[in-house]
């Protein structure tokens, strides 16, 4: 029995089949241990825990309860084959019934022990499987936890780096703000110091002015007191010779003072005369400038006239080119009617060239229209607000004529009319400046007469009145001079603006003439290329023309239509 139990503990296989010989040779101690299932369980797992012992005791109790009610004479049926083979030869019936009962009891105990071992083995296997599964789950959980720990550590490091960068940025911002605050505080302190310094300087200046005023008032009071005292002295000494002598001395002193004052007034009068001479020189210089401006305006008019002549020459050359193009077109239409029809590719190329020429013509018309609009704007700007009422009818008629025609077509002769009107306006402005110059010359003559009158009357009037009048005249002359300079400056600015506008108009006209010449050159090249292509085709296809003579009627129509398109294009130009 003990060997069987040791075999169960040592191996994980099924329990060996017990035999009757082994059961008979068991010692008494082993037999006593096998008789109780609890003792067998304790023998198998001597170091088991309390829960395992309780579970084994419950299972043995259940097995014992299931085997006790059975007939003691019957053999156990759990493993009939193994028990029948292991029992060996049955004892003779003549043996002692007690021995038989002991043997049967031992067999039952063996069966119970076998079942218990099998159950324990299965339970051990289940527990090993559960242990492996739990170990696997624990390993997976540990790996998952390690991954989460690694991920959390990495995120923590990233966040820590971000927060460190953010903290460094915030620290730099705080440092910059602190520096800015310090600079602002420094500026504020400097401004306060400057303000206090300015207030102190102003207060000191005010105090100095007050002191000067007080000193002047004191001097005036002293002088008045002296005058009063002198008058009292004169009254007191009027009856005596000494008083007459003192009076004579005082009169001599007054005469000396008046002579000094007279010299001063003469000096001031000479300065006033010099200023008058300077004003006269300024007026003469302004007259010279007006003459120069008139001469420049005349030069601009000559340039405008020359530009108009050049424009007429360009138009005449354009008309000659149109006539030449019409002749070439007619000649080409006649040649195309007699020759073979052009190919589809040449027709496409010619149509594309015609479209390009049409686009260039449209661009030229747009540029002419822009130049015409700009000249009209200059005319309206030169008219000014004073002549707005008189120009309403002209503008309305021009607007109606421009509205009836296309927005891109310049009316016939309208550009020349606008240029003539611009010239007329410039001439009217120059003529309007002549009365201003005349008025200035009249004022200068009046100033000269007044100067002569001042020279004549300077000897008769008192010096003080002469000085005051001279000062007033000088102020009036300065005011008039300033007004004249302001008017001349305005006229100069108007003349400069007119010159700049006229130069812009002339430049635009030159650009248009250059574009027209370039367009004429392009037209010459296109016509020459078309003629060369026609001659080359006539030379390269003499035989094909004879073979395709029957299709000449059909081929004439597109060439004639193309010639009509080209002729209409030059007719529009």
Curated annotation (Swiss-Prot):
Q: Which InterPro entries match?
A: Spindly/BICDR_Dynein_Adapter
Keyword Coiled coil applies: yes
Q: Where does the record place a coiled coil?
A: 118-376, 440-525
Question: Low complexity bias: where?
Answer: 387-396
What UniProt keywords apply to this chain's record, in alphabetical order? Coiled coil, Cytoplasm, Cytoskeleton, Neurogenesis, Transport
Query: Per its database record, what is this protein's job?
Result: Acts as an adapter protein linking the dynein motor complex to various cargos and converts dynein from a non-processive to a highly processive motor in the presence of dynactin. Facilitates the interaction between dynein and dynactin and activates dynein processivity (the ability to move along a microtubule for a long distance without falling off the track). Predominantly recruits 2 dyneins, which increases both the force and speed of the microtubule motor. Component of secretory vesicle machinery in developing neurons that acts as a regulator of neurite outgrowth.
What is the protein's quaternary organization?
Part of a tripartite complex with dynein and dynactin, acts an adapter linking the dynein motor complex and dynactin. Interacts with KIF1C. Interacts with RAB6A and RAB6B; interaction is specific to Rab6.
Q: Which family does it belong to?
A: Belongs to the BICDR family.
Q: Please give the name of this protein.
A: BICD family-like cargo adapter 1
């Amino acid at each position: 029995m003990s060997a069987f139990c040791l075999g169960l503990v040592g191996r994980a296989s099924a329990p060996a089949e017990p035999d009757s010989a082994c059961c008979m040779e068991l010692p008494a101690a082993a037999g006593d241990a096998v008789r109780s299932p609890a003792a067998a369980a304790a023998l198998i797992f001597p170091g088991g825990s309390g829960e395992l012992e309780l579970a084994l005791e419950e299972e043995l109790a259940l097995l014992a309860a299931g085997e006790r009610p059975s007939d003691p004479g019957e053999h156990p049926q759990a493993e009939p084959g193994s028990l029948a083979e292991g029992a060996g030869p049955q004892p003779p019936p003549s043996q002692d019934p007690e021995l038989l009962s002991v043997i049967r009891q031992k067999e039952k105990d063996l069966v119970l022990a076998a079942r218990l071992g099998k159950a324990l083995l299965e339970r051990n296997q289940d527990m090993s499987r559960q242990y492996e599964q739990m170990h696997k789950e624990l390993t997976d959980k540990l790996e998952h936890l390690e991954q989460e720990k690694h991920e959390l550590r990495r995120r923590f490091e990233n966040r820590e780096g971000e927060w460190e960068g953010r903290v460094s940025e915030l620290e730099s911002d705080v440092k910059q703000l602190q520096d800015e605050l310090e600079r602002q505080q420094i500026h504020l302190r400097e401004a306060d110091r400057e303000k206090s310094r300015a207030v102190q300087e102003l207060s000191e200046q005010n105090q100095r002015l007050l002191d000067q005023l007080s000193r002047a008032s004191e001097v005036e009071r002293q002088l008045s007191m002296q005058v009063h005292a002198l008058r009292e002295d004169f009254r007191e000494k009027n009856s005596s010779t000494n008083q007459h002598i003192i009076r004579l001395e005082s009169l001599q002193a007054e005469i000396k003072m008046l002579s000094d004052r007279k010299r001063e007034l003469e000096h001031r009068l000479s300065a006033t005369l010099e200023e008058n001479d300077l004003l006269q020189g300024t007026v003469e210089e302004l007259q010279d400038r007006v003459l120069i401006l008139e001469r420049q305006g005349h030069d601009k008019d000559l340039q405008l006239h020359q530009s108009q002549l050049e424009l007429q020459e360009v138009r005449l050359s354009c008309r000659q080119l149109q006539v030449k193009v019409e002749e070439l077109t007619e000649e080409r239409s006649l040649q195309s009617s007699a020759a073979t029809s052009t190919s589809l590719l040449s027709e496409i190329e010619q149509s594309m060239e015609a479209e390009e020429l049409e686009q260039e013509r449209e661009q030229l018309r747009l540029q002419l229209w822009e130049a015409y609009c700009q000249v009209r704007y200059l005319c309206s700007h030169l008219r000014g607000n004073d002549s707005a009422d008189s120009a309403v009818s002209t503008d309305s008629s021009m607007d109606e004529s421009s509205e009836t025609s296309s927005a891109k077509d310049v009316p016939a002769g309208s550009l020349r009319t606008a240029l003539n009107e611009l010239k007329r306006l410039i001439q009217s402005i120059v003529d309007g400046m002549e009365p201003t110059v005349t008025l200035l010359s009249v004022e200068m003559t009046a100033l000269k007469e007044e100067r002569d009158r001042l020279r004549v009357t300077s000897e008769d009037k008192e010096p003080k009145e002469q000085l005051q009048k001279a000062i007033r005249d000088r102020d009036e002359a300065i005011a008039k001079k300033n007004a004249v300079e302001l008017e001349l400056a305005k006229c100069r600015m108007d003349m400069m603006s007119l010159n700049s506008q006229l130069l812009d108009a002339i430049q635009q006209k030159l650009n248009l003439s250059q574009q027209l010449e370039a367009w004429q050159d392009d037209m010459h090249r296109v016509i020459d290329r078309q003629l060369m292509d026609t001659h080359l085709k006539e030379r390269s296809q003499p035989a094909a023309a004879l073979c395709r003579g029957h299709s000449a009627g059909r081929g004439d129509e597109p060439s004639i239509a193309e010639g009509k398109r080209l002729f209409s294009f030059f007719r529009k130009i």
